[in-house]
Amino acid sequence: MKLRYKILNGAIALTLVTISTLAVTLAYTKNCESPVIREINNPMKAIIYRCYGGPEVLEQAVIEIPEPLAHQILVRVKAAAVNPVDWHYMRGSPYIMRLMTGIGVPNDQGIGTDFAGIVEKVGSDVTKFKIGDAVFGGGGGPFAEYVLANASKS
């Protein structure tokens, strides 16, 4: 067998092993853990998910109202739409979605994508929006009373 065919076969075998390992890693789903009880100074209600699965993994929780960073705005959510992407995030499928949301468990517990609301706070670098502005946007887990959004994307 020629050397180039041996190298090609080795490269194909390595590629298959890599793809198989990635598939097994992405398919891993960690069990849901109980929430950690801690003191909350600025509470808000939110729908969250701590693990991948069906609607049974969604729970109403009381969490901290987030503080906007310099480039963010805090929006009081007036409406949040259910988007097909939310279903994929919640289930973690197709497994390639887990590269964005977290392998084993979600990195961000907030769920939801589309929202509309009123600006409550603005970060120090934000000049495009002011408190009281009506805005809409996507991302960040808006199935909650408040959501953070990047000012440049809203």
Language model features with spans:
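Glycine-rich beta-strand-centered segment in the early N-terminal region that forms part
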Residues: 65-81, 94-141
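Short N-terminal binding/cap micro-motifs at the start of the first secondary-structure element
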Residues: 54-58, 84
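A structural motif shared across PLP-dependent enzymes of the aminotransferase-like
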Residues: 139-151
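Extended, non-globular alpha-helical segments
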Residues: 78-79, 152-154
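Terminal signal-anchor or tail-anchor transmembrane helices
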Residues: 3-33
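Cytochrome P450 core scaffold surrounding the K-helix E-X-X-R motif
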Residues: 85-91
